[in-house]
Amino acid sequence: IETVGKNDAPVRDVRVGITWTGVWGKRCGLGRTYASPATAHATVKGFGKLTEMTTLELARYARSWHLVEAAIGVAAINSMIKPKGERGLNALDFLIREGKNKKITVVGAFPRLPELREVSKELWVLELDPNLVNPSEGILPATAAEHKIPRSDLVAITGSAIVNKSLEHLLELSKNAYTLVLGPSTPMSDVLFDYGADMLAGVDVLKPAQIMMKISQGGGMVSPKNCKGEIEFVVMEK
């Protein structure tokens, strides 16, 4: 958090959508919204006054175990990072190309998993939602991480794992594999390389007003394909 503090700015807007949370300060950052019926009764600290704060103050929410607050915190961190790296690259293309005949673990449900399954030697998908677990399809509960990740050649971890505090542990389990952290929640900071990531694949929000409006109106997948000219993929390698 402190490494990005030099880019602190007044908060212009905060949106908590059903899929994504956005914070707009100097730049616009995103974080995955993990909401449940239980969080409906747990009020976000400072609600109604978040735009009177700075992005660094909101970034400290990332430490919260109230996961809606944590999403606001991660989005605030991302709003203080100007993404570096190659633009316009889709990390899933890299994963499919490099995953041929490899043992792969994917943490989180990503698009194009059937393509990845076709080229890989073995593919395990770790899923937090118990309703989506299907062992016959290789979709396992997240608790299988200890068993599957250390056996993998390639590991792809959703950047949303930083919101629920599992990212550091997942990177530790992945120390013998080539590891990607990807998705809009991913902080594009080389600090993550110190924790074991080999590639970061996040986004740069080019048009904050449009993206903030879309995520607050139920926007799900945010990508250059369905938010043309408003968001861009960025990839950075160790």
Model-derived regions: residue spans:
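Electropositive, gly/pro-rich neighborhoods at or near active sites that engage anionic ligands
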Residues: 1-118, 215, 232-238
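Residues in the short beta-alpha loop(s) of Rossmann-like NAD(P)-binding domains
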Residues: 110, 129, 185
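Short acidic low-complexity segments
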Residues: 90-95, 138-150
